[in-house]
Amino acid sequence: MLGLIGKKVGMTQIFQKNGIVVPVTVIEFQPNYIIGKKTVDRDGYSALIAGSVDLKSSKVSKPIKGQYKSLKDIEPKRYVIELKGLDGYDAGDEIKVDVFKSVKYVDVTGTTKGKGFQGAMKRHNFSGGPSSHGSKFHRHLGGTGQATTPARTFKGTKMAGRMAGNQQTIQNLEVVLIDEEKRALLVKGAVPGAKGSFVVVKKSKK
C-alpha cells in the first residue's frame, strides 16, 4: 500500500479553472526513507518499513541505533510505518511525493484534537434533561444501570469522560494538487489533527 508520513500545515482554499472555490488541506512531507524490510521467511509477511523526521540524539537508545547501523547517512526516525504491497524499493531509498502523481484519492490518518474531560451531552450527543419546570438535572446523563438484576453498570456505558485525542482515518479525499518542489500535497476537505501534527497519507482503499 502506497503511503507517506507528512505534516498537516493547515487549511486554505484554491480556485479551480471553472471558478469554483475548493477548501483544501496542505500536507507537507519531510524526506521519507525505507529503513527496513519484513520478509515472509522471517516475519510471516512481506512489507517495507518507512520512517520520517529525525529523532533527537538524546532519545535514541542503543537497540534503535543498532537498527540503523547498516543505513548510511540516515538518522533514527521519530515516525515509523509499515507499507504492504509496495515493491521496487530497497533499504535507504527515499519515497518522494511524486508517487501520488497517478493517485486520485487518498486516505489520511491522524490524531484528532483532544477536548479534555467532557460531559455526556457534548461527548455522546445526549439530549439532557428538562431545562425548567422544577427539573433538578439539566445536562446530566441520566440512569447508568438497571435494577437488582444485574445490580451493576455494564462496561462501555456512555458517560462523561476524556473526549477525542484518538486515531482517526478520513477516506477518499480527493488529491487537488501536488507540489514536488515544496514536497506538498493538497487534498480536498479537512483531515484529523491540529496544525503541525503528523499524519499518514495512503492510497485510498476504496
Swiss-Prot record:
Keyword Ribosomal protein in annotation: yes
A biological process from GO: translation
Claim: Nucleus is one of the keywords in the record: no
Alphabetical keyword list: Ribonucleoprotein, Ribosomal protein, RNA-binding, rRNA-binding
Top-level lineage group: Bacteria
One Gene Ontology term, aspect cellular component: cytosolic large ribosomal subunit
Annotated GO MF terms: rRNA binding; structural constituent of ribosome
Region of interest: Disordered: 127-151
Xref: SUPFAM superfamilies: Translation proteins (SSF50447)
Oligomer status and interactors: Part of the 50S ribosomal subunit. Forms a cluster with proteins L14 and L19.
Role played: One of the primary rRNA binding proteins, it binds directly near the 3'-end of the 23S rRNA, where it nucleates assembly of the 50S subunit.
Family assignment from sequence similarity: Belongs to the universal ribosomal protein uL3 family.
Alphabetized NCBIfam families for the sequence: L3_bact
Name of this chain's protein: Large ribosomal subunit protein uL3
Organism of origin: Borreliella burgdorferi (strain ATCC 35210 / DSM 4680 / CIP 102532 / B31)
